[in-house]
Amino acid sequence: MTNLKTLRGMVDLLPSHSARWQKVETLAIKNFERAGIKEIRTPILELTELFSRGIGEATDVVGKEMYSFEDRGGRSCTLRPEGTASVARAVIQNGLLKQGPQRLWYGGPMFRYERPQAGRQRQFHQIGVEFFGLSSVRSDAELISIAWDFLNELGLRNLKLQINTLGTSEDRKNYRSKLISWLENFPELLGEDSLNQLKKNPLRILDSKNSNIQKLINDAPLLGDHLNQSSINRFESLQKVLNTLKIPFSVNQRLVRGLDYYCHTAFEIISDDLGAQATVCGGGRYDGLVEQLGGPHAPAIGFAVGMERLLILIGDRLANEIHPDVYLINKGEKAEAEALLLARQLRLQDFIVELDDSGAAFAKQFKRANRVGATWAIVIGDEEINKGEIRLKRMKVLNKDKNEILLKKSDSLELRKILET
């Protein structure tokens, strides 16, 4: 019989790592909620049309990377490759903009059929924030500050904020024709993929990871030279606000966003510690998306953080595992019933309790208590049952006379006091 394994690019999150994820998620939620941002949860499966309309037919995501299939009703469905389009759809479908501007956060798995590599699997996880109905430069700066403060509060080092402006759709239309004319002079350097992008989405070539193309685009025309005065003024205002907030940044005129719905502000937070996959957080403004998906005109801006890349950067700085406060050692029919009752009572008092269910000798159960890193072991056996007692042992204390305590089973207040010390 064939051994069943995960699909390539789909990775199990094991208990030895899940506690780190929980701590990151908890800190993210704290940062978002103190900024008045509320959670939204959307399905991982959507109609394919949502992404083809929202992200753009000409993008690599839609053209090459989506997990799409026809369901039994004949509908084309797709596992979400990103979160923004789904959140925008939910905002439209549920009429949330009728209640005023929306400040929302989301998290969960996304799916793209890419070559798996460190920090990016085919199933990957993002946590992100979206503002709908907010158009000011101040809202751009506020969103950037929320992302920046969250990542710095995690203790990450060597972070750099890069910003750019993509201007208006008219700015990009003028620039697009200039860029195409320039790139058409170098067909032998572009390769098949970039030649295809040249026809569909030439700005994506600026984001190429190919070293030869990166050298080529160093001399390409700049979008910043094709902006109208209003776009220039807006970008200068953003820089002034970021300086006021004392958030360090650099302008990267080659920075583009990979999806079609972006305009004006684009930003990335990168770390040299990640090598080629340097981006930890990416975001920008997308004022036309809601209308493009059938909703009212609604300015919007958002960002997403890649959890896998974030955990690579954090390394071992967050504890990997949650250790029990109490390991309940028990043997014998009456003792097992008493141990289960005590475990429940202690858990209801917010102690982390692991109950041994092996029926093994006490020595083996003590080894297990030590292995899981328990602070205390509580022993209930026939002797303790007959005396109406429980025996407590503080683990990892060398002096045996100081690490064992006998306590009456009925003395719950004293037990709690001891466990809290």
Swiss-Prot record:
Documented EC number(s): 6.1.1.21
Subcellular location(s) of the protein: Cytoplasm
Keyword field: Aminoacyl-tRNA synthetase, ATP-binding, Cytoplasm, Ligase, Nucleotide-binding, Protein biosynthesis
Main localization (coarse): cytoplasm
The reaction(s) this protein catalyses: tRNA(His) + L-histidine + ATP = L-histidyl-tRNA(His) + AMP + diphosphate + H(+)
Gene Ontology molecular function: ATP binding; histidine-tRNA ligase activity
Keyword Nucleotide-binding applies: yes
Pfam families membership: HGTP_anticodon, tRNA-synt_His
Domain of life: Bacteria
Residues spanning the membrane: none
Single Gene Ontology BP annotation: histidyl-tRNA aminoacylation
Matching InterPro entries: aa-tRNA-synth_II, aa-tRNA-synth_II/BPL/LPL, Anticodon-bd, Anticodon-bd_dom_sf, His-tRNA-ligase, HisRS-like_core, HisRS/HisZ
Enzyme class, UniProt record, top EC level: ligase
Keyword Nucleotide-binding part of the UniProt annotation: yes
GO cellular component terms given for this protein: cytoplasm
HAMAP family per record: His_tRNA_synth
Family the entry assigns: Belongs to the class-II aminoacyl-tRNA synthetase family.
Record's subunit section: Homodimer.
Name of the protein: Histidine--tRNA ligase
Organism of provenance: Prochlorococcus marinus (strain SARG / CCMP1375 / SS120)
Gene name per UniProt: hisS
